[in-house]
Amino acid sequence: MTQTLRDICWCGNTELTEFSPDYLACSECGTLVSKTGLMTEQLRIKDDNHDFYGKEYWLSYQTEHYGFPDIRQRARQDLPERCLYWLRTLMTYKLPPGKVLELGCAHGGFVAMMGWAGFEAMGLELSPWVVEFAQQTFNMPIFLGPIEDQQLEPESFDAIVLYDVMEHLPDPVATMSYGASLLKEDGIFIVQMPNYEEGKTYSEMVAQKDHFLDQMKSIEHIHLLSRRGASKFFKNLGFEFMQFEQQLFKYDMFFVASRQPLVPYTDEQISDSLLKSPSGRMVQALLDKSSDFNQLQVQHQNIQVQYQKSENSRAELMNIIEQKAQEITSLSPVSATVTNDLQHPQSQLAKSQEKIQHFQKNQLQQIQNQLNETEANLKVINVEIAAMKTSKFWKLRTLWFKFKRFVGIPTDNE
């Protein structure tokens, strides 16, 4: 498919810079502009079997290129998921029996959901086959062709919703301006589209495997707006009041735009509106179950967060244990060296103690021998003294001392 090169942003800026092989970047509004996206005339299906947005886009192209379910599967899967999510947001700001138009309604499931809730709902699609499929599947008013081709009454709609559509518009200003003319003064747009986060280069996105790369489908995603760009776009249309809601998918933005301040309805007001009809009661029951499921999801996410924190703590502790083990391993040689060094002086100390004990033992033995010898000598002396006391000499000595005392001569101690 040969495409005309596009070199102008929706905001009118022509000084676009290279962003990637397929996209240019606008510094004025933060939008990525496809170089080779489809042109306005290519939106009108002339050959439903071969034109880009014809029958095969819904039956095989999205499945083969993006891994999405085909339109038959989506008609079942989307009802309890995104359709309920979108309806909850719509009813936060508009209640039945408001008149609502969905651009690019695909299988028509959300149009049906709005109808069951009590809205006067209708949808638009480009492929004759898809329009027929949606009509037969959900029995809702689905019309063929771009919004500009429809004969719709100006200022007659309470809301126009477009989910994953605005990025496909070759001339979003013309299309959305026409849509704005169909809205009542207090009418709103509700939009879901990819959210380009400014500040990242293409090379950084590739290196980080950024999830937004999947949205850079240059043939069909012609304008990828940032939040700044989306705000500027709708303010230029006169819709100065914007409320960014929680997006269903992380790569998207989801918001409500209005000319007047947005005043949300309460859950009680929404429920009262739905309970007025049998089909509305069914929708209320689905919303209740959806709320229960969402709470379980939040609990599951919290558990996952706690589990991840526990895993992170466990990993940190394991790292600490491994570090300490490495420190112990590195200290083992030092410990062995110190042990060896300690063992050597301990051996010397043991030998010294052995020598001291041996010396002390010898000394004690010598002293004991000397004591024994002295004791033996003392016994000999005592024997000699005893012998002397019995001898004649001793007797004469005794008489001599007695004589000296008798004559008054001083004597030494006997």
Predicted regions mapped to residue ranges:
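Low-complexity, charge- and small-residue-enriched intrinsically disordered regions
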Residues: 401-414
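A short His-aromatic
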Residues: 164-168
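Compositionally biased, charge-rich terminal segments
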Residues: 365-396
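Conserved N-terminal segment of class I S-adenosyl-L-methionine
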Residues: 1-163, 173-178, 207, 246, ...
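S-adenosyl-L-methionine-dependent methyltransferase catalytic module, highlighting the catalytic core
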Residues: 148, 169-288, 408
